[in-house]
């Protein structure tokens, strides 16, 4: 796989909008042509080479390209938006909308990610080694269709409303989550290995949420179905005993499932 290395020259005060940083756009271009790719700096159209040193070996096909962003880009948005193939590695933090609308390939963020990581994601893989802000795998504002495919893994903590309006795919949070994971969820799988502050699965109609830590508060619209052991979800086993709930019955005909680890959640047991 050919590697193209982007080294940030500076951190702009006004954020960059860079949906063209993806293998699909870099494919078939020379290094000089890649430097001339357009991105947005506020309301100005600028060149990628104005803000990044560019080096490496180009390739003709997106699946043969690995883009390495060698440094922090905490003020650059939309990296990897709608990418279909290839790989992006960010050696630092990244701003909002990383991998939004992604259809294939892989993005690895070695630091933290801003809000809306994997928004409306349809395929591929996003791995965030640090923390993620709000709305991981969510919908666009005003839309009712969120992430529908692919996998997002966050090795740290995530903030509010992950998987909002989720329609498919899988989100794995290795740490803790704040409020309302899986709000308005319709399908897919969310696995939270840490704790949840409150309101998991609010107004969910379908899909599955697994909480291996403690849920500090739980909603009244869920029906207790009993205890299950060693549940198996989308190939991966989750060993141990779990309380099983169906809901949120604030929504007519809701069939969502929430599993909560027995060892951490005696306070919500009937």
UniProtKB/Swiss-Prot annotation:
GO terms for biological process: methanogenesis, from carbon dioxide. The keyword Oxidoreductase applies. Sequence repeats lie at residues 80-92, 99-111, 118-130, 144-156, 163-175, 182-194, 201-213. Its EC number is 1.2.7.12. This enzyme is composed of six subunits FwdA, FwdB, FwdC, FwdD, FwdF and FwdG. Belongs to the FwdC/FmdC family. InterPro entries: FMH_DH_FwdC, Formylmethanofuran_DH_suC, Glu_synth_asu_C_sf. It catalyses: N-formylmethanofuran + 2 oxidized [2Fe-2S]-[ferredoxin] + H2O = methanofuran + 2 reduced [2Fe-2S]-[ferredoxin] + CO2 + H(+). This is Tungsten-containing formylmethanofuran dehydrogenase 2 subunit C. Induction: By growth on tungsten or molybdenum under anaerobic conditions. It is an enzyme of class 1 (oxidoreductase). The keyword Repeat applies. Residues 80-213 are annotated as: 7 X 13 AA repeats of [GW]-X-X-M-X-X-G-X-[IL]-X-[IV]-X-G. Keywords: Methanogenesis, Oxidoreductase, Repeat. GO terms for molecular function: formylmethanofuran dehydrogenase activity; transition metal ion binding. Pathway: One-carbon metabolism; methanogenesis from CO(2); 5,10-methenyl-5,6,7,8-tetrahydromethanopterin from CO(2): step 1/3. Gene3D superfamilies: Glutamate synthase, alpha subunit, C-terminal domain (2.160.20.60). Catalyzes the reversible oxidation of CO(2) and methanofuran (MFR) to N-formylmethanofuran (CHO-MFR). This enzyme is oxygen-labile.
